[in-house]
């Protein structure tokens, strides 16, 4: 059996990422917004249904389901918009830092 030389091994190495800290930052952002996407709409649904629509406004059970669902859908869209905004700014910041090098 032949032993591969070092030049051949170096050619097979995977490409290096720009920065390990940028990967960690991106992963933290993604996990943060994933947690928000799960907790905020569900929490707002039950909170607004029980305390606002049925409690404060005195709506029926059927009506409170409907309006609480609307609040949850709006919350999902707000979280998605915030994620897109943060991801867009993070990407442009990393691009500017890479361009200055």
UniProtKB/Swiss-Prot annotation:
Lumenal side: 47-65
Location in or out of the cell: Endoplasmic reticulum membrane; Endoplasmic reticulum-Golgi intermediate compartment membrane; Cytoplasmic vesicle, COPII-coated vesicle membrane
Topology Cytoplasmic: residue spans: 1-25, 87-101
The keyword Transmembrane helix belongs to this UniProt entry's keyword annotation: yes
Record has Transmembrane as a keyword: yes
Entry keyword set: Cytoplasmic vesicle, Endoplasmic reticulum, Membrane, Transmembrane, Transmembrane helix
Topology term for the membrane: Multi-pass membrane protein
GO biological process: regulation of ATP-dependent activity; vacuolar proton-transporting V-type ATPase complex assembly
An annotated GO cellular component: lysosome
Main localization category: endoplasmic reticulum
Sequence intervals crossing the membrane: 26-46, 66-86
HAMAP family, per the entry: VMA21 (MF_03058)
PANTHER family: VACUOLAR ATPASE ASSEMBLY INTEGRAL MEMBRANE PROTEIN VMA21
Description of how the protein assembles with itself and partners: Associates with the V0 complex of the vacuolar ATPase (V-ATPase). Interacts with ATP6AP2.
Clinical note on disease: Myopathy, X-linked, with excessive autophagy: A muscle disorder characterized by childhood early onset of a slowly progressive proximal limb muscle weakness (especially in legs) and elevation of serum creatine kinase, without evidence of cardiac, respiratory or central nervous system involvement. Histopathological analysis reveals diseased muscle fibers that are not necrotic, but show abnormal autophagic vacuolation as a manifestation of excessive autophagic activity in skeletal muscle cells.
Name of protein: Vacuolar ATPase assembly integral membrane protein VMA21
Source species of the chain: Homo sapiens (Human)
């Amino acid at each position: 059996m032949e032993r591969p030389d070092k030049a051949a091994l170096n050619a097979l190495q995977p490409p290096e990422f720009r920065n390990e800290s940028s990967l960690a930052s991106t992963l933290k952002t993604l996990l943060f917004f994933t947690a928000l996407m799960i907790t905020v709409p569900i929490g707002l649904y039950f909170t607004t249904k029980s305390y606002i629509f049925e409690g404060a406004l005195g709506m029926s059970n059927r009506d409170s389901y409907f309006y609480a669902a609307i609040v949850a859908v709006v919350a999902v869209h707000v979280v998605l918009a915030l994620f897109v905004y943060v991801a867009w700014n993070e990407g442009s910041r990393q691009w500017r830092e890479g361009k200055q090098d």
